[in-house]
Amino acid sequence: MSVNARRLAAATLATGVIAGLVGLACIHLLHWIQALAWDMHGGTLLEAASAVSPTRRVLVLTLGGAIGALSWFLLFRRNKAITSVSAAVDGTPMPPLRATWHALTQVLVVGLGASVGREVAPREMAAAFSAAAADRLGLSAEDRRIIVACGAGAGLAAVYSIPLSGAVYTLEILLVSRSGRAVAPAFLTSGIAVLISTGFTRPAPFYTVPTLTPSLSLTVFGALVGPLLGAAGWAFKQAVARVGAARPRDWRLLLTLPAAFLVVGLIASRLPSVVGNGQASAQTQFDATWAAGAGLAFAALVLAAKTLTTFLTIRAGGWGGVLTPAVALGAGLGAVIGLPWASAWPGSEVAAFAFIGAAAFLGASMNAPFTGLILVIEFTAQGPTILVPAVLAVGGATAATTWLTRRAR
């Protein structure tokens, strides 16, 4: 084994351990915050947020906005730049302490109910410390690039216990590579990270979804609605980029973020599904039990409210992921379109439409169809039974995003 190969092997092991510890720390910090804020000692955030009073929802979210605003204001006082994971993969320095500050603030506000995802935090921390390890080991520029990307992917895998998704995310989004030199570290780091963060046994799925059954109705739905879901996911990605570029990084943060979180809290006082990173909203759409009662109007209300609170949080100065919000919005679109479809052509449950919507929308919003589909499968521990309609929907969504991207150039 050459010197470079030995160094890459050592970096792979170190990165898996780093990402696993980062994921473990983020999990425990989030659970501790949610226990304090929402009396959440088990179950889901939706159940916990629904159980507390509407006034408490408003107060907790407003507190989250105030704490987040102060933390980010202090972080940006001397340096307003934030190094993204993609930039770090390409070689831009990512100071570990600054990345940790930024990441822990994200975990804090998400724990207090912020309407953004928590997945960016472990990706940033793991990437930053993996880059430091790569520099310490003297890796070549290309091997360093691989290791930083693996750190980010393994961090994602560790915090959600999704080893396959973490590896595919690394290869499809960050490295855009299928070379053996990249594939082996991507899978090894994700596996090691999940082993450290959650152990040998898999925890309960992130979303509780009933067993999904295939049907001709669902297959035709996937084939026809896929392009629409893709266009919506593409539009979501463009809108997030525009809104994110406009968020304040100066004293205005101290005003805009608490005000935005207050608005989110007021919405949550009536609709607790908007609380948190999107799990509650998506779970509402996956639950088939409400379909016979509230039906289409309620599904549309949850979809609209989650869209509003996510964009409001980002525009006001909040930082965080959009992966789980995208799952929530995709599931909502699938449910909203699927309910009237099921009335006209019975044979499929709401959860199946929501699953297809989430996979197609997420893949389009990330410009990563493989990652999007595998993420939703691992998040729900469902999907193999309806792979044909899901793949048709993802394929149609990918075709739509490709066409829209070319037109936008």
Model-derived features: where do they sit?
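Alpha-helical transmembrane segments and immediately membrane-proximal extracytoplasmic
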Residues: 1-409
